[in-house]
Amino acid sequence: MLSVRNLVHRYGDTVAVDGVSLDVADGECVVVTGANGSGKTTLVRHCNGLLEPDDGEVLVNGTPVGEDLVAARASVGMVFQNPRDGFVGATVGADVAFGPENLGRPREEIDARVADALDAVELGGRRDERVADLSGGEQERVAIAAALAMRPDHLVLDEPFTGLDWPARQSVLDRLRALHAAGTSLIVVTHDLRDVWTLADRVVAMRDGEIALRGDPADVRGALPDAGVRPP
């Protein structure tokens, strides 16, 4: 379980997240949407301690993130918008191995984690290829594999479809469906609900740093325009 409790985050005098509470159950897919500047990216960056709250807290499996940052980051994987800016290895395998190596895991375990993660995103035969030579969709899948190699309970993806053409978007979406079916919790941040509508167990719409709407996709669809969100 990932729990956000009365979270507040400020950038100077601007309140980016204002008293937000949200629970994400094991195996659930929650889609967080809203216009630019609504606070959705700031919210999810608290989920594994990338940001510190001004008030409130985030708990991962019952433990506040700030009390055990290493455990939180092992449990909550992050895939950032434009992940190609954050690749740390020249090859696919080196990039995916980076996280487990930093955990100090044995080489045999690292190799197994890398193999499992690449298989999960259907890049098992691409381990020795240069990340820079891959397509945008393939690079997105490498970023997902790098997060999966940490064997997280929850996977947070910030605008995972940005800049991808239609076939690449569908490829990434297929991988997310498979991960969801296998029991991985997903928190997907997007301003465009068309790709993830059928994937979501719940939709959370943010506006001005607050949750304006939340619920099952079928229940909230008609109210999305009132929350400032274009329906799919």
Curated annotation (Swiss-Prot):
InterPro entries: AAA+_ATPase, ABC_transporter-like_ATP-bd, ABC_transpr_CbiO/EcfA_su, ECF_ABC_transporter_ATP-bd, P-loop_NTPase
Keyword tRNA-binding: no
Chain sites annotated for binding ATP: 34-41
Record GO cellular component, one term: ATP-binding cassette (ABC) transporter complex
UniProt GO MF annotations: ATP binding; ATP hydrolysis activity; ATPase-coupled transmembrane transporter activity
SMART domains: AAA
Record's subcellular location: Cell membrane
Top EC class of this enzyme: translocase
EC nos: 7.-.-.-
Broad class of the protein's primary localization: membrane
Keywords annotated in UniProt: ATP-binding, Cell membrane, Membrane, Nucleotide-binding, Translocase, Transport
Topology within the bilayer: Peripheral membrane protein
Domain ABC transporter stretches: 2-231
Family according to the record: Belongs to the ABC transporter superfamily.
PANTHER family, alphabetized: ENERGY-COUPLING FACTOR TRANSPORTER ATP-BINDING PROTEIN ECFA1, HEAVY METAL TRANSPORTER
Function: Probably part of an ABC transporter complex. Responsible for energy coupling to the transport system.
Name of this protein: Putative ABC transporter ATP-binding protein VNG_2317G
